[in-house]
Amino acid sequence: MIAGHHMDTIRSVTRIRLRSVEEPLDRPAAAWEAVRFLSTAEALGLLPASPESIETLDVRTVRAVLKEAAAAGVARQALAEADSRDERDADAWVDVLVHANVALADCPIPDRTWPGLADLLGIDLLAKLVGVAPASARRYLAGDRATPDAVAARLHWIALIAGDLAGSYNEFGIRRWFSRARSQLDGKAPADVLAGEWSPDDQGPRAVRTLATRLLDAAAT
């Protein structure tokens, strides 16, 4: 369960290794939105630079990530809301985090997202998933070439999926998840559905995201 002052480790990917939760984020709805926010922010490359793992779900941590997101031009309104509300109010934090999660889901930031996803998935798999040659992916990663809008949208969608999967899998498991056939995808692997010049609005990619989101829902209960 997410709720409560103590929790089993629910994430093992990179820096987020949550073991406890503090008020007011110990309310189930607040904890759920906060975990989702941190998961997505990490996948998008929005965690503040630090060598330390994040082991406690608390207001200080969430506020720091909100500031990092706002500095990247994302979720500025959510940060303003956080600054204007009583930070001891769990319901207020639910509102702030719902708005922050919507903002993260709607705002591709490829320059921040390429490095973390390349480390997580490997450049070859990531290039395949976003529909570009590995050489092109390396140029986008290095900043030698601007990421085209269509590629940025696909990269963002992969990051959202990876954030959802991080509630259930480690790095190896996430990479393997993309390659395993799924009955919910008519026997195809997610990597087969996410092939070529797809769009996040297409039915197949949306089905892949739904499949990943169900795993995040399960990890939160």
Model-identified regions with their sequence ranges:
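Non-transmembrane "mature" sequence context
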Residues: 1-221
